A protein has these predicted regions:
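Active-site metal-binding loops of divalent metal-dependent hydrolases
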Residues: 8-9, 120, 215, 268-269, ...
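Short internal beta-strands
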Residues: 61-63, 142-146, 161, 182, ...
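Short, conserved phosphate/pyrophosphate- and ester-handling motifs at nucleotide-, phospho-/glycolipid
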Residues: 162, 213-214, 273
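Conserved N-terminal subdomain of the carbohydrate kinase-like
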Residues: 2-3, 11-114, 130
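Conserved phosphate-binding/catalytic region of the ribokinase-like
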Residues: 110-111, 126-143, 147-155, 168-260
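Short, glycine-rich nucleotide/cofactor-binding loops
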Residues: 6, 32-40, 123-124, 265-276
Length: 386
């Protein structure tokens, strides 16, 4: 699938330095001694940069740099001192809109599955309604990151306002279109094709919120191009935005930031010992999420005999959940975890010891990685000493 990005291109300029004294010229303001500076893409360009870096076939409508806003942030010793915005006022807004629309009229929208309108109200999307009509006529779905009232985006397939922007909308007007409402401190609320989704946002240490919305949008559209269902697209978007805010300055997502690589392993884990812990830690290093299939008490008895397990399934599950590198522990009652493996659909299944990959249950579902067990550590040996 191919994506087109149209919108306000912003250049985010960061000036870094240190402060040791106040400005001797007065005003009780800090004197910043510059050490270095960098310029990053922002606005519509950041959406395009993220999508491209995630491997999406993506184009952007460029326009004269003279009409693009530059946001300069002065940062001293890790703290923002001020932000200076530069542009050319109403003239630039007018000229940007005219140039973008003239270019858009020559675009064959049938080449694109999705068109993203990234609106920062800087003029590039002056003709947003006309652009949406052109895209719709070619069967291209329009997704809008808005900066204004609904009337500017009539006909869009989906609108992604933040909470403040959503309050400006009359929901009687947008009742028949898809929406995603984001807010840093609240769950993401989405309504797509008549289904409502509510996704929690896990707390993270926030370094900078600049560009988080652009990363969210890019990650969501990335999911669409991969053919994922809407819930998974939203989960990816939340994950992408959460990753972005943990970095200073605008951040460009890497594939590993949005795609989870699920690792699965299974066992009884009756008496948790060092061998287990090192094996599980090695398993987690192969991906981003470690899921353990834990044999139920009845399953353990069938495998190990009536004297086992020593610890019941709830205690064994809780012990595994306490390990920082374990993400999920699922109890299964069958003799093998095959049905659970098919349900989870992991990328990798790990097994310890001298197994051959072709003998491991689930080898038809995922790749198999055999990890060495730590010598002289086993539950059987521990039990024999009791």
């Amino acid at each position: 699938m191919r994506v087109l990005v149209i919108g306000d291109i912003i250049r985010d300029r960061y000036v870094y330095g240190s402060t040791e004294r106040l400005n001797p010229e007065g005003g009780a303001v800090p004197l910043v001694r510059q050490t270095y500076e960098e310029t990053k893409l922002g606005g519509a360009a950041l959406v395009w940069d993220n999508l491209t870096n995630l491997g999406v076939d993506c184009d952007i409508v460029e326009y004269d740099k003279r009409f693009q806003d530059v946001k300069t942030r002065i940062i001293s010793d890790g703290h923002y001192i001020c932000r200076v915005d530069s542009g050319f006022g109403d003239v630039a807004v007018y000229l940007a809109g005219e140039e973008v629309y003239n270019k858009v009229k020559a675009i064959d929208f049938s080449r694109y599955s999705y068109c993203i309108l990234s609106d920062y109200d800087k003029g590039a999307l002056t003709y947003s309604k006309e652009i949406i009509k052109l895209a719709n006529a070619a069967g291209c779905k329009v997704i809008v990151d808005p900066k204004g009232t609904y009337e500017r985006y009539v006909g869009a397939w989906l609108i992604k306002p933040n909470k403040l922007e959503a309050n400006k909308f009359n929901y009687n007007d947008i009742d028949n279109i898809n929406t995603i409402t984001t807010n840093a401190e609240s769950p993401v609320v989405a309504r797509i094709d008549g289904v409502t989704y509510l996704l929690p946002v896990d707390p993270v240490e926030v370094a900078d919120v600049t560009g988080a919305g652009d990363c969210f949008l890019a990650a969501f559209v990335y999911g669409l191009t991969k053919g994922y269902d809407y819930r998974k697209c939203l989960e990816i978007a939340v994950r992408g935005a959460s990753t972005a805010v943990q970095h200073r300055g605008t951040y460009v997502l890497e594939p590993e930031d949005v795609e989870q690589k699920i690792i699965f392993t299974n066992g009884c884990f009756d008496i948790l010992h060092r061998g287990h812990i090192e094996y599980l830690e090695s398993s987690k290093k192969l991906g981003t999420k470690l899921v353990i299939g834990l044999n139920s008490d009845d399953s353990v008895k069938r495998l190990k005999g009536e004297s086992r397990p020593i610890n019941n399934q709830e205690d064994r599950q809780r012990a595994l959940q306490s390990l920082r590198f374990v993400d999920e522990v699922v109890i299964f009652d069958e003799d093998t975890p095959y049905n659970l493996i098919k349900q989870i659909n992991p990328d990798i299944i790990t097994k310890g010891g001298d197994y051959k990959p072709e003998d491991v249950i689930g080898n038809d579902v995922a790749d198999i990685v055999i990890l060495p067990y730590k010598e002289n550590y086993s539950t059987t040996n521990i039990v024999s000493k009791l």
